[in-house]
Structures are given as C-alpha cells and as structure tokens.
C-alpha cells in the first residue's frame, strides 16, 4: 500500500500549553483516505496519534492503527516530511 497524498492542517493555538501541532489526512493508493491523524509535541519530541474515540468508561481506543512498527515509521516519516515542507520554520522537529 503506497501513500499517494499527505495533507496537513496546521493548528494555530492561542493556548501556549497546547501540544497539538496539526491534523493530517493521508491517502493510500488514491483509493483510501484516513482523516484526523494528529501531530503532537510531547516531552520526548514530536509524534503522531492515530484517530481514536472515547469509550463510555473514558478510555480512548484507536479507530485505525498500523499493526507493525515498519509501517508506522513509513507513515510517520511521510507525515513529518510534508509537515516540514509546509512549515519550513519547524525544522527543529524532534521526532519522539
């Protein structure tokens, strides 16, 4: 499965404590779209969070997620490459 498009929606937070940097939409093989991947700045660097929902008991469950580390790295790399391309001032992006 090839990543054929990555679209970044940067979040301009007025709250200085906010860790959310962007929402991402990824297209696979020009036939499947995955919305609402989040780019987050954490204590150990920047990482992606897959789309999830909150259960009745307050836990968060992924709606979709990579099942192996190799694909997660491919996906994360494509997202970060596009993020830096669209936000050249973010070259200090530290991957967590």
Swiss-Prot record:
Native species: Borrelia hermsii (strain HS1 / DAH)
Keywords linked to the UniProt accession: Cell cycle, Cell division, Septation
Protein role: Could be involved in septation.
InterPro entries: SpoVG (IPR007170), SpoVG_sf (IPR036751)
Any single GO BP term: sporulation resulting in formation of a cellular spore
PANTHER family noted in UniProt: SEPTATION PROTEIN SPOVG-RELATED
The keyword Cell division is annotated on this UniProt entry: yes
Keyword Cell inner membrane (UniProt): no
Pfam families: SpoVG (PF04026)
Name recorded for this polypeptide: Putative septation protein SpoVG
Similarity section: Belongs to the SpoVG family.
SUPFAM superfamilies listed in its UniProt record: SpoVG-like
